[in-house]
Amino acid sequence: MHAYTLIAPGKINLYLEIIGDRPDGYHELIMILQSIDLADRITLRPNGVQQFRLYCSHPQVPTDESNLAYRAAKLMQQEFPKQFDNFGGVDITIDKRIPVAAGLAGGSTNGAAVLVGLNLIWQLGLTQPELQGLASLLGSDVPFCVSGGTAIATGRGEQLDPIYDLDNLWVVLAKYTSIAVSTPWAYKTYRQLFNNTYISDRERIQARTHQVHAGPLMGAILQKDGAKIGRLLHNDLEKVVLPEYPQVAHLRETMAKMGGFGTMMSGSGPTVFTLCESYAQAEKIKQHIRENISDIDLQLWVAQLSNMGIQVEIAG
């Protein structure tokens, strides 16, 4: 049996609007999700035994059942017990390049990669929609990570409508290593502060979703108009995260003054990004940020927007 190494890209949010509560306890969301080429490498190697083993040298990445990559493997075992009996388990090695606890879907994309890899190793022949159906059982971001590119995500984030790929722009990403924002905390706090704005009527939710589909940001994406996209970036979670984390708020303010098309926090944070027209501009802004904030706790990356989801890098 072949071993596979898969490229697992991270993602940013270009748009995140919280519409209301769902009966399942999650929030009703409208998001525009975008893959970036800052990616982990996930290697799946058949191990000849009836178990999964997970390896990662990054000290902040768990290697037990709390890791989404491990949970993805166990889900495949539960769904396809005959194939697990026939082919056995795999050793999963994560080469972690996406920052941890950053709002960039690093855990979700690792889980998506394991689904894709086991589909190949176990010769299941699952289609992308079938893989995304399994992915939705693992987490809201995992279905998007399977397909990648640019997409509108609704429901709790698992209902995807792919749109014209946006791969002509770059981003500077910045994150304080010591700061981690709890996603459940961010949504819970938003509910406490802003539930008077929530919509519960299904028709009104659908109407709001349609407004975003037909709205100016979608038009800017279709036209690949970076300047307009930058002006229309939106994230409701900034309303609760930035007041609670002044370092992140200061970082966002600093980056917004450096040029580029627009600056925003991604997801529940704490990563902040600036949209750029070129690699050269992104590198220049990265250098300016470093000159203005000398804190060694601050990490910076440059990445290109990507039209790719999980990809096989090596089979052998």
UniProtKB/Swiss-Prot annotation:
InterPro entries found in the cross-reference section: GHMP_kinase_C_dom, GHMP_kinase_C_sf, GHMP_kinase_N_dom, IspE, Ribosomal_Su5_D2-typ_SF, Ribsml_uS5_D2-typ_fold_subgr
Catalysed reactions listed for this entry: 4-CDP-2-C-methyl-D-erythritol + ATP = 4-CDP-2-C-methyl-D-erythritol 2-phosphate + ADP + H(+)
Domain of life, per lineage: Bacteria
Principal EC category: transferase
The enzyme's E.C. designation: 2.7.1.148
Pathway the protein takes part in: Isoprenoid biosynthesis; isopentenyl diphosphate biosynthesis via DXP pathway; isopentenyl diphosphate from 1-deoxy-D-xylulose 5-phosphate: step 3/6
Amino-acid positions noted as binding ATP in the UniProt annotation, renumbered to this chain: 99-109
BP term (GO), one: isopentenyl diphosphate biosynthetic process, methylerythritol 4-phosphate pathway
Alphabetical keyword list: ATP-binding, Isoprene biosynthesis, Kinase, Nucleotide-binding, Transferase
Record-annotated active site: 11, 141
GO molecular function: 4-(cytidine 5'-diphospho)-2-C-methyl-D-erythritol kinase activity; ATP binding
HAMAP family recorded: IspE
Stated family: Belongs to the GHMP kinase family. IspE subfamily.
Function: Catalyzes the phosphorylation of the position 2 hydroxy group of 4-diphosphocytidyl-2C-methyl-D-erythritol.
NCBIfam families, per database record: ispE
PANTHER family xrefs: 4-DIPHOSPHOCYTIDYL-2-C-METHYL-D-ERYTHRITOL KINASE, CHLOROPLASTIC
Name of the protein in its database record: 4-diphosphocytidyl-2-C-methyl-D-erythritol kinase
Protein's gene: ispE
